[in-house]
Amino acid sequence: MGLRRGPCPAALLPGGFLFLLLLADPALLAGRRPPVVLVPGDLGNQLEAKLDKPTVVHYLCSKRTESYFTLWLNLELLLPVIIDCWIDNIRLVYNRTSRATQFPDGVDVRVPGFGKTFSLEFLDPSKSSVGSYFHTMVESLVDWGYIRGEDVRGAPYDWRRAPNENGPYFLALREMIEEMYQLYGGPVVLVAHSMGNMYTLYFLQRQPQAWKNKYIQAFVALGAPWGGVAKTLRVLASGDNNRIPVIRPLKIREQQRSAVSTSWLLPYNYTWSPEKIFVHTPTANYTLRDYHQFFQDIGFKDGWLMRQDTEGLVEAMVPPGVPLHCLYGTGVPTPDSFYYESFPDRDPKICFGDGDGTVNLQSALQCQAWRGHQEHQVSLQALPGSEHIEMLANATTLAYLKRVLLGP
């Protein structure tokens, strides 16, 4: 934590006391540590729910709860049969008239821990290794002198929704950044991962340049899907269990489709060729020009509306307007296109390309296009062999972040 000002300016202290104060607090000699805000990615922070439902999908499902419980991540809710209860609670309901989502009847979902780090350090409150996310990075920040909930804070959000439905979140984020600036005497470093980078870019593109110059020191982007992600088509078509064996892809597909953020992350034409075939089937092939037909053929017409609602949220050629550090994984086989023998209800064969296992390399490299389009520096750092989640604990990542925060 940076030094807070006492009732007397340091310059008025007797020389001996000032010398002792400098010895006691090396931060005064080295300069203030910039406060840090962490923005997680898709699935990247806890969600809590409270129930008072008119009906349930199975007699084993809870109909009513007295208090909020952990909806994500709670591994006990992903067991066979019980997972049906979980899907019915965590899904969103799309309203075609309002072009917005709502919670299912009798379900209230909230995001715990805004301004804290616990919600994104461990996705599972039991702190199981399966749910470890930002923990190693936060531990490193603490080792460098930071204090949880003070000069390093988390900015969790409802990652099921795209930014256009999370307006209050961005107001709270701006207020927190301004508060940290006042408390710690300098601009903030934003550290985002995965879809959190798209959220951060959306936020920065809507702030005045004078505000960004004052309040933002740097933006560190880890594994950013600037141009969308190819695997999103597989998620929408046949579901993706993320290699969790107890979950069948078709079982989880309903929840994944209902999250508007899924359609938001489909590949964009400013990164991929309009001729590239992402999905091959016996009767049709699909490029990014075929999304309308794709959604028709998978039986999810609302998905096309969701895509139309979100496609223009982030402007590809409008840079963030702050010093940007893009760190991205390479050399990890990453889903690039999909071959279906039976479409869409069977798992496809996958053709792999370069990337971090989730984000395709060409999408991560999209930040290169901002060089020369903003006065601030745009730096790129490859992380060879670094997987999408593992990069948060990667030694190169942490050393790079330390240099950004504390200097060489």
From Swiss-Prot:
**Which GO molecular function terms does the record list?**
acylglycerol O-acyltransferase activity; calcium-independent phospholipase A2 activity; lysophospholipase activity; O-acyltransferase activity; phospholipase A1 activity; zinc ion binding
Query: What does it catalyze?
Result: a 1,2-diacyl-sn-glycero-3-phosphocholine + H2O = a 2-acyl-sn-glycero-3-phosphocholine + a fatty acid + H(+); 1-hexadecanoyl-2-(9Z-octadecenoyl)-sn-glycero-3-phosphocholine + H2O = 2-(9Z-octadecenoyl)-sn-glycero-3-phosphocholine + hexadecanoate + H(+); 1,2-di-(9Z-octadecenoyl)-sn-glycero-3-phosphocholine + H2O = 2-(9Z-octadecenoyl)-sn-glycero-3-phosphocholine + (9Z)-octadecenoate + H(+); 1-hexadecanoyl-2-glutaroyl-sn-glycero-3-phosphocholine + H2O = 2-glutaroyl-sn-glycero-3-phosphocholine + hexadecanoate + H(+)
GO CC annotation: what is one?
Answer: membrane
InterPro entries named among the record's database cross-references: AB_hydrolase_fold, LACT/PDAT_acylTrfase
Q: Which residues form the active site?
A: 194 (acyl-ester intermediate), 356 (charge relay system), 388 (charge relay system)
Q: Which residues are glycosylated?
A: 95, 269, 285, 394
- Mind telling me which Pfam families this protein's record contains? LCAT (PF02450)
Q: Where in the cell is it found?
A: Secreted; Lysosome; Membrane
Name a biological process GO annotation: phosphatidylserine metabolic process
Q: Which cysteine residues pair off into disulfide bonds? A: 61-85
Binding site residues for Zn(2+): 194, 336, 351, 388
Q: Cite the EC number.
A: 2.3.1.-, 3.1.1.32, 3.1.1.4, 3.1.1.5
Query: Where does the UniProt annotation place the signal sequence?
Result: 1-31
| PTM comment | N-glycosylated. N-glycosylation is important for maturation of the enzyme and normal subcellular location.
Give the bilayer topology: Peripheral membrane protein
Assigned keywords, A-Z: Acyltransferase, Disulfide bond, Fatty acid metabolism, Glycoprotein, Hydrolase, Lipid metabolism, Lysosome, Membrane, Metal-binding, Secreted, Signal, Transferase, Zinc
Q: Which domain of life is it from?
A: Eukaryota
Role according to the record? Has dual calcium-independent phospholipase and O-acyltransferase activities with a potential role in glycerophospholipid homeostasis and remodeling of acyl groups of lipophilic alcohols present in acidic cellular compartments. Catalyzes hydrolysis of the ester bond of the fatty acyl group attached at sn-1 or sn-2 position of phospholipids (phospholipase A1 or A2 activity) and transfer it to the hydroxyl group at the first carbon of lipophilic alcohols (O-acyltransferase activity).
Family according to the record: Belongs to the AB hydrolase superfamily. Lipase family.
**Protein name listed in UniProt:** Lysosomal phospholipase A and acyltransferase
Q: What is the lineage of its organism?
A: Eukaryota, Metazoa, Chordata, Craniata, Vertebrata
